[in-house]
Amino acid sequence: MGASVQLSSHSAAFEAPDHIGMTPRLSLRNITKRYPGITANDHVSLDIAPGEVLAILGENGAGKSTLMKIIYGAARPDEGEISFDGHPLGVETPAQARELGIAMVHQHFALFDTLSVTENVALGLSTGISAAEIEREIRLLGEKYGLEVDPASVVMELSMGERQRVEILRALMTKPKLLILDEPTSVLTPQAVRKLFKTLHQLSSEGVSILFISHKLDEIRELADRCVVLRAGKVVASVDPKAESEENLARLMIGNDPPTVREGSAKAGEVVFEMRHVSAPGSTRVCGIDNVSLAVRAGEIVGIAGISGNGQARFMAAASGEYLCEADRVLLFNSPVGELDTHARRISGLRYVPEQRLGHAAVPELSLTANTYLTGDSLVRSGFILRDRARSFANLVIERFHVKTPNAEKAAGSLSGGNLQKFIMGREILNRPRVLLVHQPTWGVDVGAAAVIRNSLIRLRDDGAAIIVVSEEIDELFEISDRIAVMYRGALSPAVPKTTISIEEVGRWMSGLWPDSPFTQKTSEAH
């Protein structure tokens, strides 16, 4: 399927001296890309050798994704030269790039929601390959690399973590010489990340060059042989990440000392949001929730951990009003709201930041100002949009959350993933909700922006808001949560104070092994 990869003798751990004198797999010289009001890439030059893992580090909006799009043929540079295996590279489309052996795993998934996994994978492969062959390869690669997914699943029914697996599988099936990974671990569990890294080391040892974008400094230090740092579209450093501390890498990335998340303890008040024995059906491919109960008090953050695809999406749908149930199953300020939709719950003081940015949290074709209308009830009066107020509010979000964009009239889809996430989070937080539901608050966000978002959530909590955060970042949950619960196969564990549980215990709970869970009971009954 696609061009085969020539095996080389390079070890998984790349050592720079081994490649001296070798023709670079990819060479960029003075790559420049301008958009109206911004220079995304400013005379960027870099090389990557066969078998090398090169990390690209930079803040949101530093130009990383634009550079990858240029290499992959999804964008054309205004200036500069690119060579691949010593020959000039002039690809104009991703299809041409794939033919040459360049594959990319996108940060914003390039999948068709209404097609199956097999059909999505087939779109990136040569014609003449049967669906049965593709399904077999998906299963084999999934088992080999820990990327299991049902080939018959329709993408719209998959969790974000499962969609990530589809993207990675699709890239691997083209047998690339150069694999570009844009935030590939943002929705993967620690166990899945370890499996992915094992896969990448194996591919590297086979001569595959890997360009790896990540905001997770520990991952860059673990995986990458070399790290190129971009700031404001320019290369500012090229370092051995293993020889640098995370603090030094963060300092190189943002140009000063990284911000810290402030500490503070909750002063919880009365219960303001409650779910009572809520069940929401799943399907053969989507995990529902079963008999879920949770009470959240004013002035506390409850974090919910769990491996992607264990019912988090259904839980948030039931909590936000996207899935309706009996009225008294969900209480908001002691009033039954189970039969009320998201708009009615929002008017009552509950706001929701969904997992999927584009198409769910924001309309990509609309401007940032127009995207404030979607949840800004104060921006509409008697059916008329208050445009000046909306524009002022959008600019306030941009300023407070350091969103990198020329102005508020830019389309949401033109922003980098991290900047769009900052805008969405800021839009909801600055509306001062009394109850806030957040799914993956810092997905794909750099360390500086993540600190801004986490501090904003803590300030909102201190102002008396009740907050539920669903995240696969266990460290993040321990950093901001007052209580932590775990979802597993649609069941929710008790929410316990974070001071009474360790990260290791949370990891065990993520397999359903909390005290008195239905899964431990089934295990004991079996014995």
Where would I find each of the regions flagged by the language model?
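Glycine-rich phosphate-binding loops of nucleotide-dependent enzymes
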Residues: G2-H527
